[in-house]
Amino acid sequence: MEEKYVFAEIEEKLRRRWETEGIYHVPDFSNRPKYYCLEMFPYPSGNLHMGHVRNYAIGDVVARFKTMRGYDVLHPMGWDAFGLPAENAAIQHGVPPARWTWDNINVMRTQLKLLGVSYDWRRELATCHPGYYRWTQWLFLQFYHRGLAYKAKAPVNWCPSCATVLANEQVVAGGCERCKTAVERRELEQWFFRITAYADRLLKDLAKLPGWPEKVKVMQENWIGRSTGAEIAFPLAGTDEAIRVFTTRPDTLGGVTYMTIAPEHPLVSRVTTPEHRAAVEAFTERARSLSELDRTAGEHEKEGLFTGAYCVNPLTGEQVPVFVANYVLMEYGTGCVMGVPAHDQRDFEFARKYGLPVRVVIQPEGDLLDGDTMSQAYTGPGRLVNTPGFDRMANAEAIPAITRYLEARGAARFQVQYRLRDWLISRQRYWGAPIPIVYCEGCGVVPVPEEGLPVLLPEDVAFKPTGRSPLTESPDFVNTTCPTCGGPARRETDTMDTFMCSSWYYFRFTSPREENGPWGLERVDRWLPVDQYIGGVEHAILHLMYSRFFTKVLYDMGLVKVQEPFTNLLTQGMVLKDGAKMSKSKGNVVSPEDILNRYGADTTRLFVLFAAPPERDLEWSDQGVEGCYRFLQRVWRLVNSVADEIRGAAPVPSANLVGVNRSMRRLTHQTIKKVTEDIETRFNFNTAISAAMELVNGMYHFRDRVAPVNRDPAVMREAVERLLLLLAPFAPFLADELWARTGHPESIHREPWPEYDPELLVEDQVEIVVQINGRVRDRLMVAADIAPEAMRDTVLEQPRVQALVAGKEIVKVVPVPGKLVNIVVR
């Protein structure tokens, strides 16, 4: 018997076998039900980290389990390969981004194969391959033709370090999410996707996703930010123009004492009077250079400047001063905000700073507020005051009443507004999919025809960030002919945001080599939606929102039949060490390659699955890894020690088993039930593994403490086989090797999942407690189906009980079936 599991040679042998036999190749069509299991594909940074290992191990358990349950499982892998790190590596090391990326892909593919993940590698894709980004460009054109892609001048987030623009979602705490540099605001011509056209559907359809974590849905709901209110016009005094504001609180309209407009608003230059112009221009220039977070953060000082203009409150007829304010953003609402200092804290602070009136228009029940003495704004409910025609009305009733009143006079309209902004997709960098647009002096903006795709990235470029796209440095790329008139034209030199590529890759996996379209319609109909999607919660807003948007547009185009891409979503926790996320700067990184070399793939997988539930953060523990390694060695020794004994043992009906043999079989079937439910209904892989460990303990007890003459080899054979089948998704190498060593020629990964016998789950005997006057005095085993009267008699016949009640009067005996018998004496 081999005492030790030598994983290195066994893993290498089995990897070759699995690849040769195509164990993980899944057909596109069959009579079996489908299941699409997908982990978010990685950026090819060069090496797997432990977060990757956990993500892919979780997905692999699900994929293997569903395969064993009779499904055709689509479980692919690819590479989110465009992006700034490759370009920065080119700048730093003088290596072309393409070569850096493909070298990294080769390294990470090898590491994933070492991990033993059940990917169908025939479906591998990389978003930087022309065969992929050709269809990214094709999809851009479809959006363009539907009016969903447009170019506009707009204030954008600019990262001076990366020398490119960032989407709102890519700005975190006022800095670039990638390099943390403080973000600036600039006004540039950029390409956008009109995601706001789908805001309502994106919001409402969250209700169709019961398989998503509630926190992710709440994050998306808040980002979309639906508000119901009114757009109200404040005429500008002495002009034919009006300032329009959106508000959810028309009930506070009588309390407006000033108006604020964004520094970027075109009205600023038109309404500012000559004597205020120089100061206002200096103020707006200063405010526009700040990031959005700097301008809106609670701790940042709110500043404003009087423009010299006044507007008229349409409800009261009162003129109020117009300020330009740094906290008002052009891209939110109308770019104008009415100031109601008595009932909004930010407005209150602004009014106190600039000596503006504070007028109370909502009085709470049982209190009397005075604007001159208030220390903070009142934002609660109450009744209106100082609002002619609406005084004494409850403020909740006044909201629609005032809106209707103004609407009848042409001064307001009911409106729904969203916090969500259109998706900025253009980037001034090289390593991305070129935007398939050309500019012709005669024809204007011209989309590249489909037969002209892909628009290939040139190689004769310099990568140093200058604020202009590196593609501008390639004359052969820039200079082209107009597809419409044949005259000279210039190509668009911005590239697409990498989220463009990752917003549709799950469709491409269904037919990754399709050349007549982005996917085959029959195949995408067969596999979509993704049944289980797995990835980090950090993608809740960007990738997941964009993917949902893409899917809805593609549904409207008739290219797919689903409106939501991911039925179920699991957001796994982080891998921590010493209580912190692993990072080089903290010096707490654990290399997966080191762990794989030292302990093997099965131990590595088992630990990240056993150490914590998947949605919780996992604390790295060297002792925990050692424990998983020892467990697998125990399984190895146990199975090898009984292999000869159980080989050829004929099955025995459960009805013929008694005593220890029946108990061993019962434990086996109880474990099957536990592991099945933990994987299928809860993804509690840690408790599933724990149940397998308990089964191994029981098997050792059965082997070592039951005399061979009393031990039925068929019972041990069943326990061994079921144990290996249960371990196959978690420890695929060990399970497959031991399966072969116990006489099975086929791979265990072609075997069905074991079923349990419900009748065997019921215990023959149960332990009951004997209480005398409420105190536990004895315990004994009785038949599980014993009648209450028989329980009573059995307990009273016990010598220990008889001794304890001797000389006392038994007042009553209360049997509780399956639990206890309580005897009351005096």
From Swiss-Prot:
GO cellular component: cytosol
Gene Ontology process terms (BP): leucyl-tRNA aminoacylation
PANTHER family in the record: LEUCINE--TRNA LIGASE, MITOCHONDRIAL (PTHR43740:SF2), LEUCYL-TRNA SYNTHETASE (PTHR43740)
Residues the record lists as binding ATP: K584
Catalytic reactions of this protein: tRNA(Leu) + L-leucine + ATP = L-leucyl-tRNA(Leu) + AMP + diphosphate
PROSITE patterns from the UniProt entry: AA_TRNA_LIGASE_I
Keyword annotations from UniProtKB, A to Z: Aminoacyl-tRNA synthetase, ATP-binding, Cytoplasm, Ligase, Nucleotide-binding, Protein biosynthesis
HAMAP family per the UniProt record, alphabetical: Leu_tRNA_synth_B (MF_00049_B)
Pfam families in the record: Anticodon_1, tRNA-synt_1, tRNA-synt_1_2, tRNA-synt_1g
Listed InterPro entries: aa-tRNA-synth_I_CS, aa-tRNA-synth_Ia, Leu-tRNA-ligase, Leu_tRNA-synth_edit, M/V/L/I-tRNA-synth_anticd-bd, Methionyl/Leucyl_tRNA_Synth, Rossmann-like_a/b/a_fold, tRNAsynth_Ia_anticodon-bd
Enzyme Commission number(s): 6.1.1.4
UniProt main location, coarse: cytoplasm
Short sequence motif named 'KMSKS' region, residue ranges: 581-585
Family: Belongs to the class-I aminoacyl-tRNA synthetase family.
Protein name: Leucine--tRNA ligase
Location of this chain's protein in the cell: Cytoplasm
